[in-house]
C-alpha cells in the first residue's frame, strides 16, 4: 500500500516517438501524419496525443523522445509549450523510454504513452492516475479480450485459448519513475524482450495493476487506422 504523503507526486508523461512507422507507407513517421477536422482541429497524431495528456490537471510535463534525425517535431506549434521537452531516443522502444526517464525525477511517476495513440479518454486517464494513491508498483490501462483466441503452429490451429483472464495491454502505463528505470535496465541487461513497460516490471517480480480501459483507445499502426482514429477523436468532442 502506498504510504500517504503531504503532497501527491508529480506525474510526468513520457512519449517514445523515435520510430519511423514503416508500415504506414508514408513519407514521414506516422506520429507526424495529420488527422482531424474542424471539430477536433487539423493536427498531427502526436499533437492530438500530447493534447490528451496535458488536458489532465495531474500531468505536469511531457517528455517526447525523438530520433536523432527527427526533422518534424520542432516545426510543430506545440513544440514551444514550456511543459514539453525532448530527448533523443535509442534503437528500441525500451531504450527510448529509458532515455525519456533521464528527464524525470526519481520521486515522480512516469506515465508512458504511445505517441500514435491519440484517442485517450480523460476518464480512463483519471482512473489510471488514481492508483498513485493506492500502489507502490503502478499499473496499466488494458481492454478485456472479446474475440475467440486461437493458438497455432505453422498456420494451423492447435487449440482455443481461454480468454476470461486475457487482456489487450494498452497505454498509458504508469509506474514510479525510479522503479521503472531499474526494471528496464535489468531486463535489457539480461537480454529480455521488453514489449511494454509492464513486461519489464513483471520480469523483476512485480505485479502491476490492470485498469480496464476503453477499446477505442487505438494505436495508429496501419493506413486503415487513420480514418478510425479520426472518427474516435470526433466522438471525444
Swiss-Prot record:
It catalyses: 2-C-methyl-D-erythritol 4-phosphate + CTP + H(+) = 4-CDP-2-C-methyl-D-erythritol + diphosphate. Keywords: Isoprene biosynthesis, Nucleotidyltransferase, Transferase. One of its GO terms (biological process) is isopentenyl diphosphate biosynthetic process, methylerythritol 4-phosphate pathway. GO terms for molecular function: 2-C-methyl-D-erythritol 4-phosphate cytidylyltransferase activity. Its EC number is 2.7.7.60. The record marks 23, 30 as: Transition state stabilizer. Pathway: Isoprenoid biosynthesis; isopentenyl diphosphate biosynthesis via DXP pathway; isopentenyl diphosphate from 1-deoxy-D-xylulose 5-phosphate: step 2/6. Catalyzes the formation of 4-diphosphocytidyl-2-C-methyl-D-erythritol from CTP and 2-C-methyl-D-erythritol 4-phosphate (MEP). Belongs to the IspD/TarI cytidylyltransferase family. IspD subfamily. This is 2-C-methyl-D-erythritol 4-phosphate cytidylyltransferase. The gene is ispD.
Amino acid at each position: 500500500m502506498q504510504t500517504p504523503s503531504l503532497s501527491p507526486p508529480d506525474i510526468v508523461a513520457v512519449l517514445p516517438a523515435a520510430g519511423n512507422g514503416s508500415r504506414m507507407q508514408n513519407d514521414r513517421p506516422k506520429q507526424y501524419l495529420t488527422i482531424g477536422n474542424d471539430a477536433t482541429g487539423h493536427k498531427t497524431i502526436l499533437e492530438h496525443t500530447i493534447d490528451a495528456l496535458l488536458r489532465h490537471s495531474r500531468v505536469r510535463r511531457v517528455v517526447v523522445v525523438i530520433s536523432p534525425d527527427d526533422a518534424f517535431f520542432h516545426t510543430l506549434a506545440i513544440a514551444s509549450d514550456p511543459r514539453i521537452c525532448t530527448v533523443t531516443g535509442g534503437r528500441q522502444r525500451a531504450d527510448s523510454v529509458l532515455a525519456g526517464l533521464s528527464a524525470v525525477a526519481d520521486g515522480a511517476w512516469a506515465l508512458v504513452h504511445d505517441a500514435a495513440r491519440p484517442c485517450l479518454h480523460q476518464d480512463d486517464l483519471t482512473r489510471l492516475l488514481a492508483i498513485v494513491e493506492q500502489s507502490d508498483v503502478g499499473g496499466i490501462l488494458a481492454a478485456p479480450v472479446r474475440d475467440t483466441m486461437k493458438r497455432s503452429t505453422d498456420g494451423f490451429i492447435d487449440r482455443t485459448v481461454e480468454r476470461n483472464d486475457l487482456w489487450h495491454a494498452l497505454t498509458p502505463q504508469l509506474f514510479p519513475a525510479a522503479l521503472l528505470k531499474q526494471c528496464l535496465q535489468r531486463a535489457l541487461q539480461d537480454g529480455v524482450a521488453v514489449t511494454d513497460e509492464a513486461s519489464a516490471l513483471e520480469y523483476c517480480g512485480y505485479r502491476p495493476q490492470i485498469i480496464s480501459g476503453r477499446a477505442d483507445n487505438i494505436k495508429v499502426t496501419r493506413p486503415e487506422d487513420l480514418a478510425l482514429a479520426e472518427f474516435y477523436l470526433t466522438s471525444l468532442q
